[in-house]
Amino acid sequence: MSSNFKTPLSVYVLYDKDNTKGSETYEKIYHLLCRNSSRPFEDGLDIPVFFRTDMANQIPPIDINFSNKTIAILLVDDNMYCNTIWDEYIKELLVKEDNGALKIFAVKLSKYAFDINPLLQEEQFICLKNENIETDWHEFQIRLYDNILRYLKSYKVGQKLKLFISHSKKDKDHLGESTAISLRDF
């Protein structure tokens, strides 16, 4: 492999060190996008997933040269909102986003999340019914995948995505067919 190789996509999960679910949420996202290390024979998406948090009053930078496209997922809870270290860091991320170097998705885990930075647009937020990734895990996965697809394909918010879903028409319980029909009619 040459030293010029870049992975197509990398994802960074950012959370405040005082977020009690931050590390656990990072691991779940890692298993979702990269692979589940406790099941080594299962295939995964193999998207590199890294974390960033505010240890020792600093946050390591995101390496935008590692991949062709980079996503930063901000887990915006009350701790991140109240921590001034994140203010500058998010400003730096927004500059990189303006330059096309990365895309920011913020997850609303606090009623104050929209106020963390006025330059973060509401469309950039993944909003969950209960503001809790653990209880809204299925909803979070759908919204995350939707945002990733839109970013990779340069789709705008509101623009319809077209997906091809392969299914078996001969499965005994007809689960594949019924799932395909329900998705088609969604």
Q: Where in the sequence are the language-model features?
A:
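Amphipathic helical hotspot of TIR/SEFIR-family domains
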Residues: 68, 74-112
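Short glycine-/acidic-enriched loop or helix-start segments at secondary-structure transitions
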Residues: 83-86, 116-117, 175-176
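Residues that flank catalytic or metal-binding motifs in active/ligand-binding sites
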Residues: 103, 121, 161
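Conserved N-terminal substructure of TIR/SEFIR domains
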Residues: 1-75, 93-100, 131-186
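Conserved beta-strand scaffold positions in the cores of enzyme catalytic domains, especially
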Residues: 104-106, 124-127
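Glycine-rich, charge-decorated loop segments at or immediately adjacent to ligand/cofactor-binding or catalytic sites
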Residues: 112-125
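Acidic metal-coordinating catalytic centers involved in nucleic-acid phosphodiester chemistry
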Residues: 108, 116, 128-131
